[in-house]
Amino acid sequence: MKNMLKTTVLLAALTGLLVIIGDYFGGTGGMIIAFLFAVVLNFGSYWYSDKIVLKMYRAKEVSPAEAPNLHRIVDGLVMKAGIPKPKVYIVQSGMPNAFATGRDPKHAAVAATTGILELLSYEEMEGVLAHELAHVKNRDTLISAIAATLAGVVTMLAHWAQWAAIFGGFGGRDDDGNGGIVGLIAMAIVAPIAATLIQLAISRSREFAADEEGARISRKPWALADALEKLEYGNSHYRARVSDVQAKESSAHMFIVNPLKGGAVQSLFRTHPVTDERVRRLRAMKF
């Protein structure tokens, strides 16, 4: 219920943002066009956001014959978690990471990068996938996928506004002055902040909850703790290969650890809790 409320709020916020932009640049006609566009976008976000994210990372669905260990782990964990088996995907990237997506447990998918499969042991992968299945069980995946889609749209608007301002803008309501360009510049500044706030709406507390639930599913909290330490180090020292699929800022919150590097300012808006704290909590768990 809580996640459905967040989903509704996010979709309503996107509609409001687009209508305001439409009103600024096109008056009543612009508002109507923006509203219709928002309706289509909201529908697509709800039903297809998971497919958009998987396509964004060029994730390939794999069969038990293609990835036997991965399927063996998932098969064992879904029985313990009491949820349907999700589709299993692999992302061709040396970046060691994983994520889950899908609008509900019956339409879910888990994805692991080639980097994480090379880095972690069998039991550590159990810990990671148990965490991702906990997100599925807790129905975090819909709100995460929608947030990724909406953040991507907002970021696209920011880039559009930036280039429009550089090349003279569209005048907006104030065709005789600089109102249009000022509005575009304001949008270029505000939109990335809005995208970040969308991601922060996906509370960091859900990661702690998924860690705890994942540990209960696997019965191996130490395995997830070991995996998180390796992943934190692996992502901070990751060097992309030419063929690698790169992490997108709009969907960074979906991964088990933050795949993006950032300085002190970005840490204020981090989408994940500090890894050391997650590890400390996991190591304190007893079963």
Curated annotation (Swiss-Prot):
GO cellular component: a single term: plasma membrane
Membrane topology: Multi-pass membrane protein
Cofactor note: Binds 1 zinc ion per subunit.
Any GO BP annotation: proteolysis
Binding positions (Zn(2+)): 131, 135, 207
Enzyme Commission no: 3.4.24.-
Cofactor(s) the protein needs: Zn(2+)
Primary localisation category: membrane
UniProt entry keywords in alphabetical sequence: Cell membrane, Hydrolase, Membrane, Metal-binding, Metalloprotease, Protease, Transmembrane, Transmembrane helix, Zinc
Gene3D superfamilies found in the cross-reference section: Metalloproteases ('zincins'), catalytic domain
Positions of transmembrane segments: 7-26, 30-49, 150-170, 181-201
Enzyme class: hydrolase
Positions annotated as active site in the UniProt record: 132
CDD domains xref list: M48B_HtpX_like
InterPro entries, per the entry: HtpX_protease, Pept_M48_protease_HtpX, Peptidase_M48
One function term, GO molecular function aspect: metalloendopeptidase activity
Family classification: Belongs to the peptidase M48B family.
Annotated NCBIfam families: PRK03001.1
Protein name per UniProt: Protease HtpX homolog 1
